[in-house]
């Protein structure tokens, strides 16, 4: 539903006009944009990712020579952790406070958007708790909440279009190239309206994911106890 509404408003440009009617289908004015090489609604602009949200962090791996850098409470996110997950609650590896603090500028607060930029480009997900990533990932730390879902789907569209043109998205994209991606940017009012509609949908996915992970953990904790007879299942 969130993706469908994004496509309707920001791809087909049939967001509600002043009369509540679909903008483009109702004859809304479209203007050519040189940066995007296509028409966009009058009043919209083309903006780079760095102009929309300027806090972009490229991940880094702390020194593997010091084992004390790993195995703690800080999730160390890689592409495999993001793949298939809109929200990343847990990573395969973690960092200790020592390891994470050794590169303190790489901390990502909850809600930051991680985007793979080396190898398979365009794998994306939001961190659901304090985290850091490896160097294959660029992340956006949001200063404006209303940019979150819009940025996620806009980048998805960008990478899908790039794949359609080249046949694949296997390449490398450095921080500057990622920050320089242009997207069609609407009014703040429209962004806020979209954010208010889709946020509950994203929150539901986040809550459900958390509950599933908790159930899996309970199962993993209980199974060994059942196997060695420390607990039993009451069939009554």
Predicted region positions:
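Glycine-rich, mobile lid/loop segments that gate access to catalytic sites or pores
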Residues: 2, 6-13, 20-27
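Short, well-ordered loop/turn and helix-capping segments at boundaries between secondary-structure elements
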Residues: 11, 120, 143, 157-161, ...
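DNA target-recognition domains and sequence-specific DNA-contacting regions of bacterial/archaeal
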Residues: 20-186
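Non-catalytic DNA-recognition/assembly elements of restriction-modification systems
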Residues: 1-5, 27-60, 76, 184, ...
């Amino acid at each position: 539903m969130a993706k469908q509404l994004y496509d309707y408003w920001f791809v087909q440009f049939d967001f509600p006009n002043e009369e509540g009617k679909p903008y483009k289908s109702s004859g809304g004015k479209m203007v050519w944009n040189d940066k995007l090489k296509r028409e966009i609604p009058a009043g919209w602009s083309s903006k780079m990712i760095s102009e929309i949200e300027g806090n972009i962090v490229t991940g880094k791996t702390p020194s593997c020579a010091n084992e004390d850098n790993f195995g703690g409470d800080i999730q160390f996110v890689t592409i495999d952790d993001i793949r298939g997950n809109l929200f990343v609650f847990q990573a395969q590896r973690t960092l200790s406070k020592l390891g994470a603090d050794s590169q303190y500028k790489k901390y990502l607060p909850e809600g930051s958007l991680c985007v793979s930029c080396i190898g398979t480009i365009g794998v994306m997900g939001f961190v659901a708790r304090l985290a850091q990533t490896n160097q294959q990932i660029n992340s956006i730390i949001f200063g404006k909440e209303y940019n979150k879902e819009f940025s996620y789907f806009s980048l998805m569209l960008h990478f899908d279009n790039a794949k359609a043109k080249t046949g694949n998205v296997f390449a490398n994209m450095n921080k500057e190239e990622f920050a320089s991606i242009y997207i069609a940017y609407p009014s703040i009012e429209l962004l806020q309206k979209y954010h208010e509609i889709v946020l509950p949908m994203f929150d539901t996915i986040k809550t459900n994911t958390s509950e599933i992970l908790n159930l899996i953990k309970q199962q993993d904790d209980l199974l060994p106890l059942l196997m060695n007879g420390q607990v039993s299942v009451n069939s009554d």
